[in-house]
């Protein structure tokens, strides 16, 4: 770590810490007013945002990014309007700050009141998707937290203009003591430049990395600060021979094809050996644009498929490839899922309640779906307005991380002279 990199990180984190203290005094109305202005600025600056995004897209073409990665990077009119809608939904959510979690009077007369309070300073590291900066900054601001945002180099120009809109809205608000440092954007995209931030456990309260396996490992191995992991999504689906026929293909196509470059897109499909339409199903998936890879048992039923290797079943493709394996039972499917899963999203298509219960109770992931698309594993779809990400860990939060998960608690104890005996 160079002296310059260390001082750069310390300067940003120190300002964010100071800014977080001022945020605590804001009312819900004041916070929502700033978010409303950001919402308006997004729509007013659509042309400028798309222009900056085009620079990132052109750079992506030169770098040879996959079509799925380019889709993650794209900002068009529809997505900008969706970002504005997301802010509106966050504004309309109840403010968790100040919520009473517990109130009681102890036998000795002490009054205990536990309330939700902001975590403080949240650093989020993310890749590719520039809309993430709007979701995280909005959620952080509404929950009273300062945020430090570090996006990937591929979305640099998009991230820069989006963060500047927050700075403009905050500057126009004239709120006392609230500065643009409540939303800090790290312009240095070199991975090694992140390390100095990871040592500032006296200034940054939590780090939330969302991205590939390499990023998660890098942050976890180098950070002194608590890390909430938003790991890769190796999403698995078990297709039972007892599934309702008319829902199978629409769910599989939606789960895989709608947006293949996101973490809740399907990656592995396990089909019961007695499912009656395996050949037709795989053919229909190919017609829908899915690149089907099959293990040897699948190849014996549907010849000429490319081989799905053992490594493929551990892989978050983030494109149209799909690994397929034929299994003997729900237990066989579960054993495979337990082996390959990243703990993100699992799904079963079946009409057998006993089989469904076995599947639900036997797996351990952030979300388990029954007879619906895996694409619903999303903060917005879960009614959270938006999400910081989808946590694959088990501590503090698991699954979509929304407003309430950006808070902790403080207990206020009031007495009348009591001393402990």
Curated annotation (Swiss-Prot):
E.C. designation(s): 1.2.1.41
Key words, A-Z: Amino-acid biosynthesis, Cytoplasm, NADP, Oxidoreductase, Proline biosynthesis
Keyword field contains NADP: yes
Pfam family membership, one: Aldedh
SUPFAM superfamilies the UniProt entry points to: ALDH-like
Record carries keyword Membrane: no
Catalytic activity as recorded in UniProt: L-glutamate 5-semialdehyde + phosphate + NADP(+) = L-glutamyl 5-phosphate + NADPH + H(+)
InterPro entries, per the entry: Ald_DH/histidinol_DH (IPR016161), Ald_DH_C (IPR016163), Ald_DH_N (IPR016162), Aldehyde_DH_dom (IPR015590), Glu-5-SA_DH (IPR012134), GPR_dom (IPR000965)
GO terms of molecular function: glutamate-5-semialdehyde dehydrogenase activity; NADP binding
GO cellular component terms given for this protein: cytoplasm
Superkingdom field: Bacteria
Subcellular location: Cytoplasm
Primary subcellular site in the record, as a coarse category: cytoplasm
Biochemical pathway: Amino-acid biosynthesis; L-proline biosynthesis; L-glutamate 5-semialdehyde from L-glutamate: step 2/2
Top-tier EC class: oxidoreductase
GO biological process assignments: L-proline biosynthetic process
Function, in words: Catalyzes the NADPH-dependent reduction of L-glutamate 5-phosphate into L-glutamate 5-semialdehyde and phosphate. The product spontaneously undergoes cyclization to form 1-pyrroline-5-carboxylate.
Family: Belongs to the gamma-glutamyl phosphate reductase family.
Name by which UniProt lists this protein: Gamma-glutamyl phosphate reductase
Organism, scientific name: Leptospira biflexa serovar Patoc (strain Patoc 1 / ATCC 23582 / Paris)
Gene this chain is encoded by: proA
């Amino acid at each position: 770590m160079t002296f310059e990199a260390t001082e750069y990180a310390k300067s940003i984190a120190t300002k964010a810490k100071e800014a977080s203290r001022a945020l605590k005094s804001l009312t819900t109305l004041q916070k929502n007013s700033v978010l409303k202005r950001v919402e308006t600025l997004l729509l007013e600056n659509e042309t400028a945002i798309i222009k900056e995004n085009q620079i990132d897209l052109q750079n992506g073409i030169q770098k040879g990014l996959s079509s799925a990665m380019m889709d993650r990077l794209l900002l068009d009119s529809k997505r900008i309007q969706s970002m504005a809608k997301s802010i509106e939904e966050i504004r309309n959510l109840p403010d968790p700050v100040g919520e009473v979690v517990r109130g009681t009077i102890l036998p000795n007369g002490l009054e205990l009141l536990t309330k939700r309070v902001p975590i403080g300073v949240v650093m989020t590291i993310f890749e590719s998707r520039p809309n993430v900066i709007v979701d995280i900054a909005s959620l952080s601001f509404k929950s009273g937290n300062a945020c430090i945002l570090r996006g990937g180099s591929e979305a640099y120009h998009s991230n820069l203009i989006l963060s500047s809109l927050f700075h403009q809205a905050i500057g126009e608000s004239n709120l006392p003591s609230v500065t643009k440092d409540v939303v800090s954007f790290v312009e240095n995209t070199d991975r090694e430049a992140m390390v100095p931030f990871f040592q500032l456990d006296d200034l940054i309260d939590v780090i939330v990395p969302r991205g590939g396996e390499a990023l998660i490992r890098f942050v976890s191995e180098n950070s002194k600060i608590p890390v909430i992991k938003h790991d890769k999504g190796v999403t698995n689906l078990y297709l039972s021979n007892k599934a309702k026929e008319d829902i199978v293909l629409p769910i599989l196509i939606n789960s895989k094809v709608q947006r293949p470059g996101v973490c809740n897109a399907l990656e592995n499909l396990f089909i019961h050996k007695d499912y009656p339409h395996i050949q037709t199903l795989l053919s229909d998936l190919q017609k829908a644009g899915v690149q089907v890879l099959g293990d040897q048992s699948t190849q014996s039923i549907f010849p000429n498929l490319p081989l799905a290797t053992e490594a493929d079943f551990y892989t978050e493709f983030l494109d149209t490839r799909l690994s397929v394996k034929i299994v003997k039972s729900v237990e066989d499917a579960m054993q495979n899922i337990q082996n390959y899963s990243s703990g993100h999203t699992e799904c079963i298509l079946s009409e057998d309640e006993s089989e469904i219960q076995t599947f639900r109770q036997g797996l351990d992931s952030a979300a388990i779906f029954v007879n619906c698309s895996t694409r619903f594993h999303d903060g917005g779809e879960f009614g959270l307005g938006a999400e910081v990400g989808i946590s694959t860990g088990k501590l503090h939060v698991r699954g979509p991380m929304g407003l309430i998960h950006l808070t902790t608690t403080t207990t206020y104890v009031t007495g009348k002279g009591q001393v402990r005996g």
